[in-house]
Amino acid sequence: MPTIQQLVRKGRSPKVVNTKAPALQGNPMRRGVCTRVYTTTPKKPNSALRKVARVRLNGGIEVTAYIPGEGHNLQEHSIVLVRGGRVKDLPGVRYKIVRGALDTQGVKNRGQARSRYGAKKEKK
């Protein structure tokens, strides 16, 4: 425990909190422009072609973001909304694109968990 004299000299340093989505700079979401849309393969036990996009955020930071759901309409220069949230089997992918916002369309014929994928309720 420090003495009062040591506290007068040095003071207490605040705890540094590490953020899991630093590119968002404390915001829940950021807007960005797709610079490249492509597919990658996941880590060892899994096998697929995962859809990802390289996105330049408004602050000028470039991140790799996952495109959730089946099928998408994204291409280069699409304006997207990016949120935090990593994809466990894709190393380096720490962001996800919000479906149904800005240029991204919702998932077609989605029945359950529709709000996560920007899908409207189907007419009976």
Swiss-Prot record:
Pfam families: Ribosom_S12_S23 (PF00164). NCBIfam families: rpsL_bact. This is Small ribosomal subunit protein uS12. GO terms for molecular function: rRNA binding; structural constituent of ribosome; tRNA binding. The modification 3-methylthioaspartic acid is found at residue 89. Residues 111-124 have a biased composition (Basic residues). The gene is rpsL. It comes from Micrococcus luteus (strain ATCC 4698 / DSM 20030 / JCM 1464 / CCM 169 / CCUG 5858 / IAM 1056 / NBRC 3333 / NCIMB 9278 / NCTC 2665 / VKM Ac-2230). Belongs to the universal ribosomal protein uS12 family. Keywords: Methylation, Ribonucleoprotein, Ribosomal protein, RNA-binding, rRNA-binding, tRNA-binding. One of its GO terms (cellular component) is small ribosomal subunit. Residues 104-124 are annotated as: Disordered. GO terms for biological process: translation. Part of the 30S ribosomal subunit. Contacts proteins S8 and S17. May interact with IF1 in the 30S initiation complex. With S4 and S5 plays an important role in translational accuracy.
